[in-house]
Structures are given as C-alpha cells and as structure tokens.
C-alpha cells in the first residue's frame, strides 16, 4: 500500500499561481480486534502495521508483550488487524481511554491523565547510557537523513531508537504516538533491549510523548523541538533526560543533566 499519494495543487509563489503535483501523506484507518472483540481504530500510515499493533497493545497494557500474542493478521483491503491473544488485561482494555488524574511517583504533582498510564509507567533507573554533545549532533544528522517522507510531505512524524553510535530502528507515521508504537513493537519482536537506548523524535516533547518514552523504557529523548512544562516535570520525576532544540551546534538539556556531557 502506498504511503504517499500525489495530488494536483495550485501553488502561489513569486506573485503568481502555478499548477504542480504535490506529495501528500496517506491516511489509513486500522481497526484492531483482539480475540474477535473490536478494541480501537487507529488512523495511521499504512506501513509496519504489525509493529504498530504489537507496540500499541503492549504500551497500553492490553497485553504484556509478544509472548501474549499468538498471531496478528493484517487485512489491508478492509483495514482490519485481527489479533489472537492468550492473555488480555481486560481492565486496561476497558479503561484505556478513561481520564484519570493521580500523583506521580508518590508526589503531590498531578501528572497522569489516563488510568492505564498511571499503572504502566515506572521511575527510570539510572542506566549506563550517556551521550556527549558530539554524539547527539551526529545522531540527529543521521535521523534527518532517514526522514525522506517527512521532507517530501511535511505531514508525518518521525521517531527512532538509537544507541550512542547508530540508529537501530526508524519509523514514521501521521500519528506521533504511532511512530513510537511502531518502534516499540519492532524492538519487542526482535528482543532488542531499550534500557540502554535513546529515542529521537521529530516534534515537540509533550507529556504524552514523554509517557510513551517511559513506557518504552528509554532514559533519554532527543528532539529538534522543545518539551512542554508538564513533560519536563514528568521527566524529572521519572528520571528521564530530555534534550531539545538540537539544531546546528547547539542544544538545550531540560532534565537528567548527568546523562549528557
């Protein structure tokens, strides 16, 4: 299935209109069924769909990981993903989208907005991953080189899982959560540890993206954009390093300073 379509448009430039062909990101609704029960419809980019399903179900706490999944059958023609699972957390499946505010890590600040997030996120333990600024600049350069669809359409989000030296997985999607779920799903299926890895993200680091990073088990997130105040507060409490505004030869470290040298 094509992830990009080509549309005739009228562009205004230098005082005149001209008709050109423009690349546009494809939008694809995927409905996930777990043991023949409809769970959710995700609007996504139609590639790496099995990775998306596995990553989504695990990050939302519906399953504990690939060991709970017998099979994933993607039916592209109808937009269905049929999952056979030997274990399903029915509580998280039922209350996945219920708004719920609780204090983070036993502190008084109210940070989590969904019940499943509060139960699935733990304080990140100090790992052995540390990054120098030179490493970060090199990783961001490689990340940009892997962002062809973003530059072509301007309509997708990019995410990557990386070590200190290289990008391991790179995924893009029209949904920012989806891009991270695709990475998580691939890492889970490959048995790739995320504890000593970092996330690179193309957009701003919102509290939702910070929670996704925590669910993946990564201790560092890097972005060309900035984090929000709530994301920084959560990062401090969850012991996650946030680095933003990585542009040219400068960057800002907002939390977890000890991991960046």
UniProtKB/Swiss-Prot annotation:
One of its GO terms (molecular function) is sulfurtransferase activity. Gene3D superfamilies: 3.10.20.10, Cytidine Deaminase, domain 2. It is found in: Cytoplasm. The active site is at residue 105. Pfam families: FdhD-NarQ (PF02634). Keywords: Cytoplasm, Molybdenum cofactor biosynthesis. This is Sulfur carrier protein FdhD. It comes from Listeria monocytogenes serovar 1/2a (strain ATCC BAA-679 / EGD-e).
């Amino acid at each position: 299935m094509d992830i990009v379509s080509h549309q005739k448009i009228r562009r205004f430039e230098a005082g005149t209109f001209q008709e050109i062909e423009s690349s546009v990101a494809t939008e694809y609704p995927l409905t996930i069924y777990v043991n023949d029960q409809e769970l959710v419809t995700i609007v996504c980019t139609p590639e790496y769909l099995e990775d998306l399903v596995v990553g989504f179900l695990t990050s939302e706490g519906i399953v504990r990981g690939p060991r709970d999944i017998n099979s994933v059958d993607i039916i592209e023609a109808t937009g269905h993903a049929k999952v056979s699972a030997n274990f399903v957390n029915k509580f998280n499946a039922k209350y996945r989208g219920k708004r719920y505010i609780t204090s983070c890590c036993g502190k008084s600040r109210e940070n989590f907005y969904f019940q499943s997030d509060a139960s699935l996120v733990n304080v990140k333990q100090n790992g052995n991953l540390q990054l120098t600024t030179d490493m970060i600049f090199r990783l961001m350069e490689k990340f940009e080189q892997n962002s062809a669809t973003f530059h072509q359409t301007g309509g997708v989000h990019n995410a990557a899982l990386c070590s200190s030296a290289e990008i391991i997985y790179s995924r893009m999607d029209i949904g920012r959560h989806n891009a991270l779920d695709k990475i998580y799903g691939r890492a889970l299926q490959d048995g790739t540890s995320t504890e000593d890895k970092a996330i690179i993200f193309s957009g701003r680091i919102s509290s939702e993206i910070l929670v996704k990073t925590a669910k993946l088990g990564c201790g560092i997130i890097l972005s060309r954009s900035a984090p929000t105040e709530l994301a920084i507060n959560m990062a401090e409490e969850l012991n996650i390093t946030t680095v933003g505004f990585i542009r040219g030869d400068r960057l800002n470290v907002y939390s977890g300073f000890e991991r960046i040298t």
